[in-house]
Amino acid sequence: MTDTRAAAIAETIEIDPLRPLLIVDADEVLFQFMAAFLTFIGEKGHTFVFRSYALAGNVLAYKDGPPLERQTVSDLVTEFFEKRTREIPADLEAAPALNRLMLKGVQIVILSNVPSIAVEDRRYSLNAANIKFPLAPWSGPKGTAVAALASKTQGKTIFIDDIASHHESVADLAPEVYRLHYVIHPKLRALLGKVEAANDQAENWFELEKFIRDHALKN
């Protein structure tokens, strides 16, 4: 089933077989998901504690209150995407960096685990942020999708994501893909620390762009 989904995405998106490919996550890479989510739950009287790189277990019912149930947090995330996807602010460094890379011949795909109810809002947000590249909506581990997309080009493929398990999935199924880890929110980035499955980690889009140029555009 997953292989079929991945093949369908690879078939849908046009990829030049001779140019490098950059596959980019959206939340916490292009968009400031965490900052917007904190505002959203704060409006409901909840607070967030940075104890682990997860939402479940870290959203409190009120200040110093008990953690919300996992299903309640899941419902909050769904409601957030349904109502606020268009309002999540972009990382202002992302669009200029991506467009500079595009002008150098890098082709770009946005691979986002966005809920189906928010796909069109995510497209709107990407366009509004001047990130006008194909969006590949996804769910679950990203290894099969990245492998399918990477198989369409002889050029180098680069993958950027904030989630360690996605890097592990890509390392397992597409080890030739160069994996860059990046998290916009500094507290989350510090909390996660070193990601063993990533080839490199960056603290901003300036560093990401340099890594990509050095890997994809130099012989």
Predicted regions: what is each one?
Residues 115-158, 164-173:
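Substrate-recognition "cap/lid" segment bordering the active-site pocket of phosphatases
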Residues 16-17, 103-106, 150-156:
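Glycine-rich phosphate-binding loop signature in dinucleotide/nucleotide-binding domains
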Residues 13-14, 146-152, 207-219:
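Short amphipathic alpha-helix with an adjacent loop that forms part of the alpha/beta core around
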Residues 134-140, 197-207:
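Short acidic-hydrophobic, aromatic-tinged amphipathic segments that line or gate anion-handling sites
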Residues 67-70, 79-109, 116-121:
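Short, acidic loop-to-helix structural element flanking the phosphoryl-transfer center
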Residues 2-71:
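Active-site neighborhood of HAD-like aspartate-dependent phosphohydrolases
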Residues 158-203:
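Acidic, Mg2+-coordinating phosphoryl-transfer loop and its flanking beta/alpha structural elements
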Residues 144-147, 188-197, 211-213:
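Short, charged, surface-exposed secondary-structure boundary motifs
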